Regions:
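Extracellular/surface-associated beta-sandwich interaction domains
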Residues: 1-308
Protein backbone atom coordinates (compact mmCIF):
# COMPACT_ATOMS: atom_id res chain seq x y z
CA UNK A 1 0.00 0.00 0.00
CA UNK A 2 1.05 3.61 -0.42
CA UNK A 3 3.67 5.06 -2.74
CA UNK A 4 4.92 2.42 -5.21
CA UNK A 5 8.48 1.16 -5.19
CA UNK A 6 10.60 -1.42 -7.01
CA UNK A 7 11.23 -4.18 -4.47
CA UNK A 8 14.75 -5.15 -5.52
CA UNK A 9 15.30 -7.69 -2.73
CA UNK A 10 11.77 -9.12 -2.93
CA UNK A 11 11.04 -8.93 0.79
CA UNK A 12 7.83 -6.92 0.37
CA UNK A 13 9.07 -4.07 2.56
CA UNK A 14 10.46 -0.73 1.38
CA UNK A 15 14.14 -0.37 2.29
CA UNK A 16 15.54 3.02 1.18
CA UNK A 17 19.06 1.55 1.08
CA UNK A 18 18.07 -1.20 -1.38
CA UNK A 19 14.77 -0.46 -3.08
CA UNK A 20 13.97 2.26 -5.61
CA UNK A 21 10.98 4.64 -5.59
CA UNK A 22 9.40 3.31 -8.77
CA UNK A 23 6.41 1.39 -10.07
CA UNK A 24 5.66 -2.04 -8.74
CA UNK A 25 3.62 -3.12 -11.76
CA UNK A 26 6.12 -2.07 -14.43
CA UNK A 27 7.54 -4.67 -16.79
CA UNK A 28 11.17 -4.46 -15.67
CA UNK A 29 12.33 -6.91 -18.33
CA UNK A 30 10.83 -5.07 -21.29
CA UNK A 31 11.26 -1.55 -19.89
CA UNK A 32 14.16 -1.56 -17.42
CA UNK A 33 14.44 2.22 -17.64
CA UNK A 34 11.12 2.48 -15.80
CA UNK A 35 12.32 0.37 -12.89
CA UNK A 36 15.64 2.22 -12.80
CA UNK A 37 14.07 5.67 -13.10
CA UNK A 38 15.26 6.21 -9.53
CA UNK A 39 12.92 9.08 -8.69
CA UNK A 40 14.21 11.14 -5.81
CA UNK A 41 10.76 11.50 -4.31
CA UNK A 42 7.52 9.58 -4.85
CA UNK A 43 4.19 10.47 -3.24
CA UNK A 44 0.94 8.52 -3.47
CA UNK A 45 -2.62 9.20 -2.42
CA UNK A 46 -6.11 7.91 -3.18
CA UNK A 47 -9.40 9.79 -3.46
CA UNK A 48 -13.00 8.86 -4.26
CA UNK A 49 -16.37 10.53 -4.75
CA UNK A 50 -18.36 8.60 -2.12
CA UNK A 51 -18.92 11.54 0.26
CA UNK A 52 -22.25 12.68 -1.15
CA UNK A 53 -22.29 15.96 0.75
CA UNK A 54 -18.81 16.94 -0.36
CA UNK A 55 -19.43 15.88 -3.96
CA UNK A 56 -22.73 17.71 -4.33
CA UNK A 57 -21.35 20.86 -2.73
CA UNK A 58 -18.81 21.05 -5.57
CA UNK A 59 -20.92 20.93 -8.74
CA UNK A 60 -24.20 19.33 -7.68
CA UNK A 61 -23.56 15.82 -9.04
CA UNK A 62 -24.18 12.69 -7.00
CA UNK A 63 -21.45 10.06 -6.45
CA UNK A 64 -20.99 7.44 -9.16
CA UNK A 65 -18.26 5.43 -7.45
CA UNK A 66 -14.98 6.56 -8.96
CA UNK A 67 -11.66 5.96 -7.21
CA UNK A 68 -8.50 7.78 -8.29
CA UNK A 69 -5.06 6.60 -7.21
CA UNK A 70 -2.47 9.29 -7.88
CA UNK A 71 1.28 8.75 -7.98
CA UNK A 72 3.47 11.86 -8.11
CA UNK A 73 7.23 11.77 -8.59
CA UNK A 74 10.19 13.97 -9.43
CA UNK A 75 13.96 14.13 -9.78
CA UNK A 76 16.62 16.24 -8.05
CA UNK A 77 18.57 17.05 -11.22
CA UNK A 78 19.92 20.12 -12.97
CA UNK A 79 18.81 19.15 -16.50
CA UNK A 80 15.34 19.37 -18.05
CA UNK A 81 14.15 16.26 -16.19
CA UNK A 82 14.62 18.17 -12.95
CA UNK A 83 12.20 20.82 -14.23
CA UNK A 84 9.29 18.37 -14.43
CA UNK A 85 6.90 16.76 -11.97
CA UNK A 86 5.13 13.61 -13.14
CA UNK A 87 1.61 12.58 -12.15
CA UNK A 88 0.00 9.23 -12.92
CA UNK A 89 -3.75 9.04 -12.37
CA UNK A 90 -5.23 5.55 -12.07
CA UNK A 91 -9.02 5.81 -12.35
CA UNK A 92 -11.16 2.84 -11.27
CA UNK A 93 -14.93 2.64 -11.75
CA UNK A 94 -15.95 0.83 -8.56
CA UNK A 95 -19.55 2.02 -8.42
CA UNK A 96 -21.79 2.55 -5.42
CA UNK A 97 -24.11 0.21 -3.53
CA UNK A 98 -26.86 0.91 -6.06
CA UNK A 99 -24.77 0.69 -9.26
CA UNK A 100 -26.09 -2.09 -11.55
CA UNK A 101 -23.63 -4.78 -12.61
CA UNK A 102 -23.91 -3.81 -16.28
CA UNK A 103 -23.30 -0.09 -15.70
CA UNK A 104 -21.19 1.72 -18.32
CA UNK A 105 -20.04 5.33 -18.44
CA UNK A 106 -20.53 5.91 -22.16
CA UNK A 107 -18.74 9.22 -22.78
CA UNK A 108 -16.10 9.92 -20.19
CA UNK A 109 -13.47 12.66 -20.34
CA UNK A 110 -10.42 13.48 -18.28
CA UNK A 111 -9.31 17.07 -17.67
CA UNK A 112 -6.26 18.79 -16.25
CA UNK A 113 -7.60 22.08 -14.88
CA UNK A 114 -5.24 24.74 -13.61
CA UNK A 115 -5.35 28.24 -12.18
CA UNK A 116 -1.62 28.77 -12.75
CA UNK A 117 -1.01 32.27 -11.30
CA UNK A 118 2.47 32.59 -12.79
CA UNK A 119 4.10 35.12 -10.48
CA UNK A 120 1.82 38.15 -10.63
CA UNK A 121 -1.51 36.55 -11.54
CA UNK A 122 -2.72 39.71 -13.26
CA UNK A 123 -0.34 39.63 -16.25
CA UNK A 124 -0.57 36.06 -17.54
CA UNK A 125 -1.12 34.68 -21.03
CA UNK A 126 -2.02 31.08 -21.95
CA UNK A 127 -1.64 28.85 -24.99
CA UNK A 128 -1.55 25.29 -26.30
CA UNK A 129 0.52 23.12 -28.62
CA UNK A 130 -1.67 20.49 -30.26
CA UNK A 131 1.26 18.41 -31.53
CA UNK A 132 2.70 18.07 -28.03
CA UNK A 133 -0.68 17.74 -26.23
CA UNK A 134 0.56 20.67 -24.17
CA UNK A 135 -1.22 23.54 -22.46
CA UNK A 136 0.88 26.29 -20.96
CA UNK A 137 1.01 29.70 -19.28
CA UNK A 138 3.56 32.46 -19.78
CA UNK A 139 4.07 36.08 -18.84
CA UNK A 140 2.76 38.92 -20.97
CA UNK A 141 5.48 41.31 -19.80
CA UNK A 142 9.14 41.18 -18.82
CA UNK A 143 9.93 41.52 -16.01
CA UNK A 144 7.25 40.00 -13.78
CA UNK A 145 6.96 41.86 -10.47
CA UNK A 146 7.32 38.65 -8.42
CA UNK A 147 10.39 37.30 -10.25
CA UNK A 148 12.05 40.69 -10.53
CA UNK A 149 12.69 40.48 -6.77
CA UNK A 150 15.06 37.58 -7.49
CA UNK A 151 16.49 39.13 -10.66
CA UNK A 152 14.94 36.35 -12.75
CA UNK A 153 13.29 36.42 -16.14
CA UNK A 154 9.63 35.33 -16.18
CA UNK A 155 9.31 31.54 -16.55
CA UNK A 156 6.77 29.50 -18.47
CA UNK A 157 4.98 26.39 -17.23
CA UNK A 158 2.71 23.82 -18.78
CA UNK A 159 0.91 20.51 -18.50
CA UNK A 160 1.56 17.76 -21.03
CA UNK A 161 -0.48 14.60 -21.66
CA UNK A 162 2.32 12.03 -21.94
CA UNK A 163 -0.10 9.10 -21.88
CA UNK A 164 -3.82 9.49 -22.42
CA UNK A 165 -6.59 6.97 -21.72
CA UNK A 166 -6.75 3.96 -24.02
CA UNK A 167 -9.42 3.15 -26.60
CA UNK A 168 -9.69 0.19 -28.95
CA UNK A 169 -7.79 0.64 -32.22
CA UNK A 170 -7.10 -2.32 -34.49
CA UNK A 171 -3.47 -2.62 -35.56
CA UNK A 172 -2.22 0.01 -33.11
CA UNK A 173 -0.39 -0.16 -29.81
CA UNK A 174 -0.89 1.74 -26.56
CA UNK A 175 0.97 2.12 -23.30
CA UNK A 176 -0.92 1.10 -20.17
CA UNK A 177 0.60 0.49 -16.75
CA UNK A 178 4.05 0.98 -18.31
CA UNK A 179 3.44 -1.97 -20.64
CA UNK A 180 2.58 -2.13 -24.33
CA UNK A 181 -0.97 -3.19 -25.16
CA UNK A 182 -1.85 -4.23 -28.72
CA UNK A 183 -5.18 -3.32 -30.27
CA UNK A 184 -5.45 -0.01 -28.44
CA UNK A 185 -4.19 3.54 -28.75
CA UNK A 186 -3.65 6.35 -26.26
CA UNK A 187 -5.85 9.38 -26.76
CA UNK A 188 -4.03 12.73 -27.10
CA UNK A 189 -5.28 16.08 -25.86
CA UNK A 190 -8.62 16.37 -27.66
CA UNK A 191 -9.41 19.97 -26.72
CA UNK A 192 -7.88 22.93 -24.91
CA UNK A 193 -9.93 25.76 -23.50
CA UNK A 194 -9.11 28.81 -21.44
CA UNK A 195 -10.96 31.59 -19.75
CA UNK A 196 -10.09 34.78 -17.92
CA UNK A 197 -11.32 35.62 -14.45
CA UNK A 198 -13.89 38.38 -14.56
CA UNK A 199 -14.63 37.97 -18.27
CA UNK A 200 -17.86 36.77 -19.88
CA UNK A 201 -16.47 33.21 -19.76
CA UNK A 202 -15.56 32.13 -16.25
CA UNK A 203 -15.46 29.19 -13.85
CA UNK A 204 -18.46 26.81 -13.73
CA UNK A 205 -20.99 27.52 -10.99
CA UNK A 206 -20.24 25.90 -7.64
CA UNK A 207 -22.80 24.03 -5.55
CA UNK A 208 -25.41 23.54 -8.30
CA UNK A 209 -25.96 20.85 -10.92
CA UNK A 210 -25.68 23.51 -13.60
CA UNK A 211 -21.96 23.48 -12.78
CA UNK A 212 -21.80 19.83 -13.83
CA UNK A 213 -23.47 20.65 -17.15
CA UNK A 214 -21.09 23.54 -17.72
CA UNK A 215 -18.15 21.24 -16.98
CA UNK A 216 -19.40 18.61 -19.43
CA UNK A 217 -19.33 21.21 -22.17
CA UNK A 218 -15.84 22.35 -21.15
CA UNK A 219 -14.62 18.75 -21.22
CA UNK A 220 -15.80 18.49 -24.83
CA UNK A 221 -14.09 21.73 -25.86
CA UNK A 222 -17.13 24.02 -25.71
CA UNK A 223 -17.89 27.12 -23.68
CA UNK A 224 -19.04 26.47 -20.08
CA UNK A 225 -22.75 26.97 -20.80
CA UNK A 226 -25.42 24.74 -19.17
CA UNK A 227 -27.11 23.41 -22.33
CA UNK A 228 -25.28 20.15 -23.07
CA UNK A 229 -27.46 19.39 -26.10
CA UNK A 230 -26.78 22.72 -27.81
CA UNK A 231 -23.23 23.59 -26.78
CA UNK A 232 -21.64 26.92 -27.71
CA UNK A 233 -18.38 26.80 -29.65
CA UNK A 234 -15.27 28.75 -28.92
CA UNK A 235 -14.49 30.82 -32.02
CA UNK A 236 -11.06 31.69 -33.35
CA UNK A 237 -11.21 35.50 -33.70
CA UNK A 238 -8.76 35.46 -36.62
CA UNK A 239 -10.61 32.92 -38.76
CA UNK A 240 -14.12 33.27 -37.29
CA UNK A 241 -14.25 29.47 -37.29
CA UNK A 242 -15.29 27.27 -34.35
CA UNK A 243 -12.42 25.52 -32.63
CA UNK A 244 -11.78 23.08 -29.81
CA UNK A 245 -8.21 24.29 -29.41
CA UNK A 246 -8.16 27.88 -28.22
CA UNK A 247 -4.92 29.90 -28.36
CA UNK A 248 -3.19 27.32 -30.59
CA UNK A 249 -0.90 29.86 -32.27
CA UNK A 250 2.84 30.28 -31.82
CA UNK A 251 3.62 33.26 -29.57
CA UNK A 252 7.34 33.03 -30.36
CA UNK A 253 6.63 33.86 -34.03
CA UNK A 254 3.30 35.66 -33.37
CA UNK A 255 1.62 33.42 -35.95
CA UNK A 256 -1.92 32.15 -35.40
CA UNK A 257 -4.25 32.85 -32.52
CA UNK A 258 -2.27 33.92 -29.48
CA UNK A 259 -3.41 35.27 -26.14
CA UNK A 260 -4.10 38.99 -25.96
CA UNK A 261 -6.79 38.70 -28.64
CA UNK A 262 -9.48 39.66 -27.77
CA UNK A 263 -8.77 39.74 -24.01
CA UNK A 264 -5.91 41.60 -22.33
CA UNK A 265 -3.46 39.80 -20.04
CA UNK A 266 -4.86 38.76 -16.69
CA UNK A 267 -5.79 35.89 -14.38
CA UNK A 268 -6.10 32.78 -16.55
CA UNK A 269 -7.59 29.30 -16.18
CA UNK A 270 -6.51 26.53 -18.54
CA UNK A 271 -8.24 23.20 -19.16
CA UNK A 272 -6.63 20.34 -21.11
CA UNK A 273 -9.08 17.59 -22.04
CA UNK A 274 -8.88 14.07 -23.43
CA UNK A 275 -11.75 11.79 -24.42
CA UNK A 276 -14.25 10.38 -24.94
CA UNK A 277 -13.74 6.85 -23.68
CA UNK A 278 -15.94 4.23 -22.03
CA UNK A 279 -15.65 2.72 -18.56
CA UNK A 280 -17.67 -0.34 -17.57
CA UNK A 281 -18.08 -1.16 -13.90
CA UNK A 282 -14.73 -2.50 -12.69
CA UNK A 283 -12.69 -0.93 -15.50
CA UNK A 284 -9.44 0.95 -14.96
CA UNK A 285 -7.96 3.80 -16.99
CA UNK A 286 -4.69 5.68 -16.64
CA UNK A 287 -3.52 9.17 -17.53
CA UNK A 288 0.10 10.30 -17.20
CA UNK A 289 0.77 14.04 -17.06
CA UNK A 290 3.99 16.02 -16.79
CA UNK A 291 4.03 19.45 -15.20
CA UNK A 292 6.97 21.17 -16.87
CA UNK A 293 8.58 24.56 -16.31
CA UNK A 294 11.42 26.54 -17.79
CA UNK A 295 13.16 29.83 -17.17
CA UNK A 296 15.48 31.32 -19.76
CA UNK A 297 16.42 34.45 -21.65
CA UNK A 298 14.57 32.88 -24.59
CA UNK A 299 10.89 33.53 -25.17
CA UNK A 300 9.15 31.67 -22.31
CA UNK A 301 6.76 29.57 -24.47
CA UNK A 302 9.74 28.28 -26.46
CA UNK A 303 11.46 27.42 -23.17
CA UNK A 304 8.65 25.21 -21.92
CA UNK A 305 8.22 23.55 -25.35
CA UNK A 306 11.94 22.76 -25.38
CA UNK A 307 11.61 21.23 -21.92
CA UNK A 308 8.81 18.97 -23.15
Amino acid sequence: KGAPFYDRDGNGVYDPNVDTPSFRDADCTATPDVCDANADQVAWYVINDLDEGAVQSLYGSKPIGLEVQNTVWGYARTDALGDAIFKKYKVIYKGTETTPDDAVIEDMYFAQWSDPDLGDFGDDFAGCDTELSLGYVYNSVDPDSHYRTFDLAPPAAGYDFLQGPIVEAEGEEAIFNFRKRSGFRNLPMTSFVFFAAGSAISDPDLGEYVGTEQWYNLLRGFQPQPDIFNPVDFVNPLTNQPTKFTLDGDPTTTSGWNDGIPLPAGDRRIVLNTGPFQMALGDTQEVLIALVAGISSEAPPRTVRTTV
